Structure formats: C-alpha cells, structure tokens
C-alpha cells in the first residue's frame, strides 16, 4: 500500500507519494502551509485518473487538464508531471532512462494515490 509522506523542509512543507516498497513515485512542490500541502494531496487523489499526454511523440495530441504529461528533460531522461484542472503541476517524477519505466511510474500513481495514507516523515 502506498503512502503520502509529508515532510517539513527549510522553505515550507512538501510531500512524496511512495509505493508500497518505499520507493518515491512522485514529489510535490514546496507549500507554505500544512493545509495547502494536504490540499495538494487531495488534488493528486482527485486527478490521478487523468489521461496521459505523451509529449515525446511528434505531433502529439494536446489534452485538456487534468492530465499526466510525459516529456524529456534536458539530460535526455523521461519524466512525468500531473497537472490539475487549472494547469498547475501537482506532482512530478524523477528522471527515467526508458519511457516504459516512466509510464509504469504513472500507473503506480494511479494505483497508489487513491487509497494512500498520509503520514509524517521521520
């Protein structure tokens, strides 16, 4: 079972969505308050059923938000981000060497986010 791990950082508070094996699937931005951080978690739960826009394919179809976007970063790695209905990025992934692994990350968000418990980081 996955979990949202809430963590205080120097500039505020953020969360990671972790898979059952403890691996980080996606990371949020830094929020100024715990309330806004928890709202971000609810937004991931609500929007994780979104479709996938694969921006690595030439002539890709632009989808409406909410959506997952797959893209290639400056280092040439595949990444995904989940955008809310308002276009804000809610969570983003680490870099993946293969697009198939990136897609598995998205599937893991879809599987884990709806039922994931919210816990405070140690």
Feature annotation, model-predicted:
Residues 3-31, 40-44, 67-97, 101-109:
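A structural feature that tracks compact, well-ordered secondary-structure segments
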Residues 33-36, 55-59, 98-101:
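Short amphipathic alpha-helical linker/capping segments at the junctions of internal repeats
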